[in-house]
Amino acid sequence: MTYCDKSNQTSYPFVLPNLPYEKESFKPHFTAETFEYHHGKHHNAYVQNLNNLLKDKEELQKKNLEEIIDWSSQNQNIAIFNNAAQVWNHTFFWHSIKPNGGGKPSGKILKQINEDFGSFEEFCEQFKAEATGQFGSGWAWLVYHNNRLQIVKTANAGTPIANGMQPLLACDVWEHAYYIDYRNKRPDYVDIFIKHMINWEFVENNLTK
């Protein structure tokens, strides 16, 4: 598992992980209310739903979260996949951001971005286009796949780990991620995400694993 090994997600019954920062830490860009709903209600609901779906499935209870995602994807169990993937996606997202983050990175990740996108500015343009262009609910991701960085988007609960990709960064573009503070202005939210929220240390740690 990527960074999520530290989140109490590795075995049934799954537990809502604590945020790695205070809910108020993203002011003035986000209010604590956004995190109270996003983490405390939406993410928590996926955790509880997953536990309820697994309560009579002893074989699945022996699997870790990534194994459950893989099993439910292969067996087309949509309910289990959706909730398991959303538990994983959200925990990964919480580590993808940090207070006073964003801006231009340095080190190996910047070198790789320049190699694969031409420049950091071009990466930002492409990432913003993919994140804002996702129709309806979903996610925008920076992944490492086929020996290069790629930007991909997934609809609803879709996750790159179900397709053999290594996720480095996640941007949640479900409306519950930004609607309290930004209403229908997803482009503004994505712009704030890039400029003020990305945890580049986390991204680089995932790249160098």
Swiss-Prot record:
Organism name: Rickettsia bellii (strain RML369-C)
Protein name: Superoxide dismutase [Mn/Fe]
Cofactor remark from the record: Binds 1 Mn(2+) or Fe(3+) ion per subunit.
Annotated Fe(3+) binding sites: H38, H90, D172, H176
Family: Belongs to the iron/manganese superoxide dismutase family.
Annotated TM spans: none
Record-listed E.C. numbers: 1.15.1.1
GO molecular function terms listed in the Swiss-Prot or TrEMBL record: metal ion binding; superoxide dismutase activity
Residues involved in Mn(2+) binding: H38, H90, D172, H176
Catalytic activity line of the entry: 2 superoxide + 2 H(+) = H2O2 + O2
Pfam families assigned to the protein according to its UniProt record, in alphabetical order: Sod_Fe_C, Sod_Fe_N
Cofactor(s) the protein requires to work: Mn(2+); Fe(3+)
Domain of life: Bacteria
InterPro entries reported in the protein's UniProt record: Mn/Fe_SOD (IPR001189), Mn/Fe_SOD_BS (IPR019833), Mn/Fe_SOD_C (IPR019832), Mn/Fe_SOD_N (IPR019831), Mn/Fe_SOD_N_sf (IPR036324), SOD_C_sf (IPR036314)
Keywords from the UniProt entry: Iron, Manganese, Metal-binding, Oxidoreductase
Role description: Destroys superoxide anion radicals which are normally produced within the cells and which are toxic to biological systems. Catalyzes the dismutation of superoxide anion radicals into O2 and H2O2 by successive reduction and oxidation of the transition metal ion at the active site.
